[in-house]
Amino acid sequence: MGLEPYEGRYTLQLQDWTERAYKKRGIEYKVVPGTTIDDTKAISVGQVLDAHGRSYFGMSQMMNLVQMMRNGEVTKDDVVFFEDMFQPGMESLPYILHQVEEKHRPTIYLRCLAQAIDPDDFVHVWGMSKWMSMYEQMCNEIPNVKILATNEEMVAHMRIANWSAPIYNISGLSFGKEEVQGRVPDRKPFIERKQRVIFGARWDQEKQPNFFMALALKYKEKHPDVEFAICQGGPLRSNNQFYVDEAKYLAKQGTLTIHENLKKNEYYELLADSRVMFNCALQDWVSNTVSEADAMGCNTLFPAYRSFPETFANDHTRMYVPWSMEDAMDKLEVLLSKPSPSIGKISDWTDGTIDRMIDIMTGKGEQWRRDGQHYRNTVSESKY
């Protein structure tokens, strides 16, 4: 049960990455189709996914899954994997599964990407947190359901919310390193790259764009030749218009460069000619931007916050104290001057995320289970 593709999001490649891993492992699978609301592959309403498009695609997909279940094509020996826990029409699953014989009840795996358990998620910004938390509780009541969390810290949020279903940490987001690198085979050596710092997250308040703008202003006082670039897959927009107005003002002043409406390959080409990907998000779980930048040979500088110590395997040289401008600037100066000896390791690890999910779904990943008494014992351990 995949996600609809968006040009400005990693969902554009998600199904391809997943199918490559399934084929490599010899997994018998079927992609349940959905119908897109239009052919734009654009987010018109909302932030993370298009509000109408996600609903339309998800419900059409659920209709097809229900048809397969009614036809007897889905049994207790099967797994139904949802790329995203939020799936319009999901309530039909517990409604059906509570009424059919056990032989017609597959195991359900839901991958959670954020939602109401994250206090900085967009559902809180838009006042949707109450009904979303109730939706999450419903998902926990689906027969034979299991939850896939993207990292240890997200597991903690699920436990705080008293989720009752079995929880597994997949320690990463889905990623296909070979496919991504294949889009830009000729990547410049680090020393030949532009002195450019990229902000690749959404320009929304939970990503703290004000911190990035303040960093650019302060850093350029001593290093005026360094470029600070905002890269967006669509037009520059935000859930707080102030950030858009301020970014455009700073662009006119020469402090920022704004790259809008980028196609994937255009974005990757910019990464392959840049030195640092910078992140200052309050709300980010692993982040696809770190995998993409790392795969393109770009240094990554992220806050030592929430999931990032796990993602970076506790690498103190590429994480700064949140929210210390001084520490961020000191580490940025180093990472602009030379490549980290650990470039490539993050994307190698996240390249295995789909395999970890396959292991869990085929009964070979119990070491990743996190709903027991000692689920916090593994938090400080480097995963690679």
What are the functions of these language-model segments?
Residues 227-244, 260:
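Glycosyltransferase donor-sugar binding loop
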Residues 241-265:
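Nucleotide-activated donor-binding/catalytic signature segment of Leloir-type glycosyltransferases, i.e.
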Residues 186-220, 229:
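Conserved donor-binding/catalytic core segment of Leloir-type glycosyltransferases
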Residues 281-283:
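Aromatic "clamp/platform" in nucleotide-sugar-dependent glycosyltransferases that forms part
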Residues 125-147:
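Membrane-proximal helix-turn-helix segments that form the acceptor-binding/catalytic region
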Residues 60, 323-326, 334-384:
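A charged, aromatic-enriched C-terminal amphipathic alpha-helix characteristic of glycosyltransferases
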Residues 1-93:
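N-terminal pre-catalytic "stem/leader" segment of glycosyltransferase-like enzymes
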